């Protein structure tokens, strides 16, 4: 092959690579821009801030904070029949998915902190039933996980989950949300090179790859087994699983911080986009990701309360007084201070 042909082939290869990269970028951006109203920043005016009366004083939401709700989505066939029956009674639009885990990220840019509040999926709260056009057609009291079940499993289900969490947290407004199917756990886990955890639960009925009392480097589907398993471990409560998810999240965060900042967020968005739904644009997600990595991360324990077995499924009832105090401490400030 002569030199001219080699140069021509080289130019063609370069052009092809650039075109492929551009197509990938357009795919990611296009995926988010097709959503109804992607946003780039919180848009909460002072007049719209919720007020909360607690212990003889008025509080208002701290608008200097930015909040992001993340929900991991999975299918729950055992609860599907009951959900379908209720959906039929309400003439609601429902899907086959529920929230497997939920956590609220609270970013304080002034203090350079990111506080993570896990929420128990079994928490009993007010849930909106949605019609075919995404409109509210009624409400009922049910597990927080069910908020995602009402809607198309797309952006309408995401907003419905945001509303349910907001109602649970005494009207606190939530700026953004991301819902991600649980299949993405293995993808993200391997993107950071795996995550090492100390296995404290007995997984012997599930796998011999998670020996109790030993450190294990999680890769692939083993990471999903670690964060999702509940019924076949010794302690089958969701509270126990949430403690395990907290351990994993803290280890994952350290791995994320070790990734090259210039390229990793774009790569992660590209790999995870088939699993994600969000109200944010791709640019906003990248910005949020960097803000989280630049912050000091604190993962709280989930709100305290009581887990009881309902007629068919577990129900969690938070301690109202402790939850009110927690919400005030995390999200609200005295009304006088906000006016000053």
Region annotations inferred by a language model:
Residues 2, 11-13, 23-340:
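Non-catalytic, solvent-exposed segments at the cell envelope interface
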């Amino acid at each position: 092959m002569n030199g001219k042909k080699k140069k021509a082939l080289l130019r063609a290869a370069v052009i092809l690579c650039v075109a492929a990269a551009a197509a990938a970028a357009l795919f990611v951006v296009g995926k988010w821009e097709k959503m109804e109203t992607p946003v780039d920043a919180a848009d909460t005016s002072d007049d719209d801030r919720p007020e909360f009366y607690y212990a003889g004083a008025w509080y208002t939401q701290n608008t200097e904070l930015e909040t992001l709700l993340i929900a991991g989505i999975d299918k729950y066939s055992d609860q599907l029949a009951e959900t379908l029956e209720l959906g039929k009674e309400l003439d609601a639009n429902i899907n086959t998915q529920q929230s497997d885990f939920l956590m609220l990220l609270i970013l304080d840019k002034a203090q350079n902190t990111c506080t993570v509040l896990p929420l128990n999926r079994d928490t009993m709260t007010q849930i909106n039933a949605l019609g075919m056009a995404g409109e509210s057609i009624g409400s009922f009291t049910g597990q927080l996980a069910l908020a995602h079940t009402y809607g198309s499993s797309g952006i309408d289900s995401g907003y419905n989950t945001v509303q349910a969490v907001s109602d649970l947290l005494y009207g606190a407004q939530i700026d953004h949300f991301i819902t991600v199917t649980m299949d993405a756990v293995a993808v993200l886990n391997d993107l950071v090179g795996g995550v090492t955890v100390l296995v404290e639960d007995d997984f012997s009925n599930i796998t011999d790859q998670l020996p109790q009392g030993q450190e294990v480097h999680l890769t692939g589907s083993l990471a999903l087994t670690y964060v999702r398993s509940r019924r076949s471990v010794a302690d089958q409560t969701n509270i126990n699983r949430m403690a395990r998810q907290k351990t994993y999240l803290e280890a994952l965060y350290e791995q994320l911080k070790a990734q090259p900042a210039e390229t990793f967020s774009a790569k992660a968005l590209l790999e995870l986009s088939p699993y994600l739904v969000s109200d944010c644009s791709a640019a906003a997600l990248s910005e949020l990701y960097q803000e989280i990595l630049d912050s000091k991360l604190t993962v709280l324990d989930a709100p305290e309360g009581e887990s009881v077995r309902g007629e068919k499924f577990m129900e969690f009832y938070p301690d109202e007084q402790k939850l009110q105090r927690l919400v005030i401490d995390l999200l609200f400030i005295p009304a006088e201070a906000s006016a000053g």
